Amino acid sequence: MAKKTPGNNGKQKLFCSFCGKEQDAVKRLVAGPGVYICDECISLCNEIIAEDHEHSHEKSEVFSEVPSPADIKSILDQYVIGQDHAKKALSVAVYNHYKRVNLKEKKSDVEIEKSNILLIGPTGSGKTLLAQTLARIIKVPFAIVDATALTEAGYVGEDVENIILKLIQNADNDIKKAEVGIIYIDEVDKIARKSDSASITRDVSGEGVQQALLKIIEGTVANVPPQGGRKHPHQEYLQVDTKNILFILGGAFVDLPNIIKSRTGIKTIGFGSEEQRIQSENKDVLMEQVIPEDLIKFGLIPEFIGRLPIVATLQELNVDMLRQIFREPKNSVLKQYTRLLELENVKLTFHDEAIDKIAELAIKRESGARGLRAIVENIMLDLMFDIPSRKDIEEVIITAEVIANRVAPTLILKKESKIA
């Protein structure tokens, strides 16, 4: 309500409804229905609006400098060994996705569809690491969710909208940032329907989840419960537009090679270890020939596959690749442990033969790159417990015997004495 007070001449004096200044103290007072605003407050409002517009413009240009596909792959190469085909496919898809986001901000007439990605590869082949690294390169919020925890609405388990909540939380509750983030849905092969024909019974953690994910992956305004959990009618929701969220889905799809083999007729031959090698190579060749019909036969519904235009396959890791993974990436297991011991002024040395044994053990356990850390954690546990309490150790040497036969590592003491 505008402020009015009686003046000396009996006339009412008018005041600005916002700052309280009298009409005589300002250049101009603009009247509205029951309110007044002075020229100074109008100027201040203009400044605030201009500042908001500037910030909005800055947000729309966040991805104006998206790295080129070659630059994205070059950074991926620093963290992930091998998998060149998958890295190229991901680099192009991510580049195009965020260029598409810019295009929408600039209100282009051309509608470019989303480039959601399906990664197919064995456990420990680098699917999650690739997705995490992409989010770091583009500098966007990132969330990982397990598809096996999801169920369709009305059943025990997580609603699919909760995957958006994790992204919001990782974006420091900034919904605008979350709306251009990346979500990695792991173990998506576990939500395949139980057979490739429609079932008359409910498949609440399979086809039902695929159906529930369709709209979110394609792009919709999702109602997200702010505290997570199940939705109920009298609850307030966070509204999140998913049209610019990049979805990367990953899974091992263990039986998929057999489906492709039955379609293509490719056979594997060989004997002993040679047979294993040939089968592994043939499996990689088979996986590269995957087509949508194979995925439908596996148990993904056609509408779901249609929302995943980019399909990239990852190779099964061999001993040579695991050796490289152990040594070479920026955040390799070897470099991490070397740095941890450096902080204690201790040198860490792994013999080449020890690294060979670690790689062979990871292959035997079928745990891929993820298994490397588990093996080394087990070997290094006692050392990592003891070393911070000791100041006499100069170097720790890990030999093949340490890995193969669980003998104690060699410790070189600062007084040149050796304890084996």
Swiss-Prot record:
The keyword Transmembrane does not apply. Zn(2+) binds at residues 16, 19, 38, 41. GO terms for molecular function: ATP binding; ATP hydrolysis activity; ATP-dependent protein folding chaperone; protein dimerization activity; unfolded protein binding; zinc ion binding. SMART domains: AAA, ClpB_D2-small, zf-C4_ClpX. Belongs to the ClpX chaperone family. Component of the ClpX-ClpP complex. Forms a hexameric ring that, in the presence of ATP, binds to fourteen ClpP subunits assembled into a disk-like structure with a central cavity, resembling the structure of eukaryotic proteasomes. Keywords: ATP-binding, Chaperone, Metal-binding, Nucleotide-binding, Zinc. ATP-dependent specificity component of the Clp protease. It directs the protease to specific substrates. Can perform chaperone functions in the absence of ClpP. Disulfide bonds: none annotated. ATP binds at residues 122-129. Transmembrane segments: none annotated. Residues 4-57 form the ClpX-type ZB domain. One of its GO terms (biological process) is cell division. It comes from the Bacteria. This is ATP-dependent Clp protease ATP-binding subunit ClpX. One of its GO terms (cellular component) is HslUV protease complex.
